[in-house]
Structure formats: C-alpha cells, structure tokens
C-alpha cells in the first residue's frame, strides 16, 4: 500500500517558473515537491539548449543549457522532492480541502496546495508526417538542435518558418557547408532582421514542403521538396535534416480540473496568482493577467508571488514574503560554507 506522505506544496512543471518556485518555497519553509513530465528539468528551454539568452537580470548572455543547469542547482538548495517522467492527469480535492494528484499510472501525490507551472501544456515537437520518417531519427533527422558542432561542414536542410527555424539557419550558416531552408508559406514568422539575414546566407525554397525522404539504411541522403500550390518537385542532396514545425501542447488537464480560463485559454489568476479553485496557484506561461511580462524574469516574479500566496493560504498569520537572502538566517550556514570553500581555493 502506498504511504500517504503529505506535502505543503506540489509544483507541476519543471521549467523556469517551476524551478525558481521550488527554490523560493524552500525559503518559505514549505515542504515542496516538484513533478515534471519529461525525463529532465528545464521545460521548453530543453528544445533550444544552445540558443543564447540575454534577458535574465544580472546574468551575462548564456546558453539555455547553462541557465537550466543553474536553475536546477538553485532549485535543489533546500532538498525538495523531485519526480521526473510523471504526467499528472487528474486532480481531486478531498473533503479536508487537501488535493490528491494522480499520474498516468495511477500513482498518487498528496498535497495541501498546488502550483501549476506547466506552460501552455506538455510540449511535444510536431513530427514529420511522412511514412518511414521515424527510422531516420537515430541518425540525421532532427527535431531540435542540441549541439551545433554536429552540423559542421555538412549540407543541412531546415524545414520550418518560425523563430527557431530562422535562428538555427543563421547560426548553422556560420559552420555548415550549405544551409537550405524550405517553408510552406512565402512569408516567415521570425523577426524581420533575422529573416533578412537568413535570406542572405542560405538558400530558400518557398512555398515548398518535404514530400519524400531518400536514404540508405538509417541515414537520409536526399530530400524531395514539393511546391505547395503547383506540386512541382525538386530534389536536393543533404547530410542532415532539421524539422521545426512547432509544438503540440497538451493542456486538457486544466480544463478537466474545472479551472476558470481566459478567452484565449490561459488560466485566470488573482493578484496573488491563485486560480478559481482555492489552494491551486499558477505561474509562468500557463497564466495571463494585466501587466503580464513575457520574459523568463517575469516567470520568476510570478513564481515567488504564487509561493507567497500559498504560504498565506496555508497559514494566514505568516509573513507576506520571505526576507531577502542577504538578511535571511536560512542562508547563514550556507554563506559560511561558501566562504570556506573560496578560502580553500585561494590557498590551493
């Protein structure tokens, strides 16, 4: 029989909002659990680990992978419970006003409050809908770019027209032998200056889409493109194919939970980031509200605000927010450890 361990707060979603909220919940002395659908933490940033992020306050330009690593290290400061590879599909409010969360396998998580930090839902890359395409995924068919250097001196075809496709094309043009971009529309959805740059350093085929993959064994050697209006076909030789056709987002859990949504489908929240259900809070891309800041930094603020809301929901007499870390007793011992480590490094 499963032991019923109760947590103060269970956070669903391990992206920037969920990770920072996990850290801040530790500052608020909450017993916290973080549940993530994927096998590793990081959220949507996992799809673009080599993209450079400039807009996190106080940090120099850094890659998505580096930012994830730092957020994970920070999130584990107070030893939270972290569960990976778990898809929460049902939430039940119990008679004592606690919540029981169930994953796909029926495993239960018991909690006094919930924070939804799952973005627009579970992100799944849109795969190429061509028969037999999956057999090339082990070699040179890619749905994201995790290492730029594997495309060095290669002929690369990129299918897609959004920001990610445009950015990858510009980056790879610096190291690849040739970059070809195909898009089913004449216009690209990326930023105008980036699109102009892409057109100057790559070969563009519009409006074309991938019709057929040609390969030997598990590797693609050529691709047939078809004109979206006339059907005219052309074949190009390639060493690698990158497909970026957007993501499917599974957000049905929010609807089934009976939470109030805005007209655009995002969660409606109060000033303290509480949803329409008592004890259920939210932060990050899953929410919309007046003054919403669409930056990673905004997710941090919403996460901390939501945790403060949780703290007062559980204990109305609690302080409205935590003391800043520079004057917080919780960090006194940790600061001493850091000083000792720094002194030891200087002595060596």
UniProtKB/Swiss-Prot annotation:
Keywords: FAD, Flavoprotein, NADP, Oxidoreductase. It catalyses: 2 reduced [2Fe-2S]-[ferredoxin] + NADP(+) + H(+) = 2 oxidized [2Fe-2S]-[ferredoxin] + NADPH. Residues 329-348 are annotated as: Disordered. Its cofactor is FAD. It comes from the Bacteria. GO terms for molecular function: ferredoxin-NADP+ reductase activity; flavin adenine dinucleotide binding; NADP binding. InterPro entries: FAD/NAD-bd_sf (IPR036188), FAD/NAD-binding_dom (IPR023753), Fd--NADP_Rdtase_type_2 (IPR022890), Ferredoxin-NADP_redctase_2 (IPR050097). Coiled coil: none annotated. Its EC number is 1.18.1.2. FAD binds at residues 36, 44, 48, 88, 123, 285, 326. SUPFAM superfamilies: FAD/NAD(P)-binding domain (SSF51905). Binds 1 FAD per subunit. Homodimer. Belongs to the ferredoxin--NADP reductase type 2 family. PANTHER family: THIOREDOXIN REDUCTASE 1-RELATED-RELATED. This is Ferredoxin--NADP reductase 1. The lineage of its organism: Bacteria, Bacillati, Bacillota, Bacilli, Bacillales.
